[in-house]
């Protein structure tokens, strides 16, 4: 596992230079000595510029909104919460058959992008994100691309904490033998893999606030920001 933040603020070329420069790959030193990495800078590129990908990077990332939400919603893959696989809104909603996330009911069915989706053949109580109004579906055509402000920004810890808290009520109505923390963290090892360590999961379970969790990152984040300076090709706006 390389010491890279979920949102590292680097282009692929810059990141490639950093991986080689810091010798993060599990290869012998002579291979690094012989490595010939060439990164060609893009003329007039601006780090703050917005652009749409010409080709969807995944069948489950069909538009700009899903890509912007991915840094947060990907963590739900380690939980019992659906992020829309098997619906018309992959990575554009959070929902569950028995825990209320919104009044909108969204069916989950297998499709080519999700042959075995979580909570298949059920109706999700879902919160569907959109640029116009996060509380409803209007204007959130899954084929639409836009540069409007995303309903949540970056890695939104509050969204994870809110979802976790909703399961406390769910735990009260299921049988005592099933009532455990794992009603939410159903794939704890995978959640920890996505986060890099088990620290984030334990912080959420311990009731830490978003501010407290973010503060715990600052020391290592500062080290990364300082280290990456040597590999940046474009003006740093962070």
Question: Where are the model-predicted features located?
Answer:
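Surface-exposed patches in mature extracellular/periplasmic domains of secreted proteins
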Residues: 30-32, 213, 234-235
């Amino acid at each position: 596992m390389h010491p890279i933040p979920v949102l590292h603020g680097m282009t692929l070329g810059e990141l490639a230079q950093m991986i080689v420069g810091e010798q993060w790959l599990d290869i012998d030193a002579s291979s690094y000595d012989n490595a010939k990495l060439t990164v060609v800078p893009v003329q007039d590129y601006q780090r703050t510029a917005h652009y749409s990908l010409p080709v969807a990077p995944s069948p489950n990332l069909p538009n700009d909104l899903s890509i912007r939400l991915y840094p947060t919603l990907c963590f739900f893959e380690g939980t019992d919460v659906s992020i829309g696989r098997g619906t018309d809104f992959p990575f554009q909603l959070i929902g569950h058959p028995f825990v209320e996330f919104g009044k909108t009911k969204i069916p989950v069915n297998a499709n080519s992008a999700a042959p075995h989706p979580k909570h298949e053949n059920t109706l999700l109580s879902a919160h569907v994100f959109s640029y116009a109004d996060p509380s409803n579906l209007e204007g959130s055509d899954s084929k639409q691309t836009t540069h409007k402000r995303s309903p949540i920004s970056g890695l939104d810890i509050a969204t994870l904490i809110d979802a976790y808290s909703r399961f406390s009520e769910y735990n009260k109505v299921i049988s005592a033998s099933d009532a455990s923390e794992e009603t939410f963290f159903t794939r704890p090892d995978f959640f920890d893999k996505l986060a890099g360590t088990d620290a984030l999961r334990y912080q959420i379970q311990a009731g830490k606030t978003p501010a407290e969790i973010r503060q715990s990152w600052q020391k290592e984040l500062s080290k990364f920001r300082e280290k990456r300076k040597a590999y940046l090709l474009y003006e740093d706006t962070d």
